[in-house]
Amino acid sequence: MAEDHPSVDLDTHLSSPRESEESAPKKNRQFYRKKVCRFCTQKLLADYKDPDTLRRFITERGKILPRRITGTCAKHQRRVALEVKRSRAVALLPFVLTE
């Protein structure tokens, strides 16, 4: 009996695509410094009455920046978000910047 399809080596088809990616040479990634929490290192507290400090944690549009961008720890990121919202409520920071 003749087979209609050629024989297939099962070992080559079972290998995952990750194995071939791992064996490929790694591309040069830019080295970045680990971001550290300013509040932990300098023993500071976020305060709604200090809009200049809080402006570092919001975008030009007024959105609160995430932890992965600012480098703050989870505890202080929650505090920053709360203080930004308080500062907006008493009109020290704008909700949205107008042009």
From Swiss-Prot:
Amino acid composition bias (Basic and acidic residues), ranges on this chain: 1-25
One GO BP: translation
GO molecular function, one term: small ribosomal subunit rRNA binding
Keywords: Ribonucleoprotein, Ribosomal protein, RNA-binding, rRNA-binding
Any one Gene Ontology cellular component term annotated for this protein: cytosolic small ribosomal subunit
Highest taxon of source: Bacteria
Ribonucleoprotein listed as a keyword: yes
UniProt-annotated stretches for the region Disordered: 1-28
Family classification: Belongs to the bacterial ribosomal protein bS18 family.
UniProt subunit comment: Part of the 30S ribosomal subunit. Forms a tight heterodimer with protein bS6.
Function: Binds as a heterodimer with protein bS6 to the central domain of the 16S rRNA, where it helps stabilize the platform of the 30S subunit.
Name the record gives this protein: Small ribosomal subunit protein bS18
Species assigned in the record: Treponema pallidum (strain Nichols)
Lineage of the species this protein comes from: Bacteria, Pseudomonadati, Spirochaetota, Spirochaetia, Spirochaetales
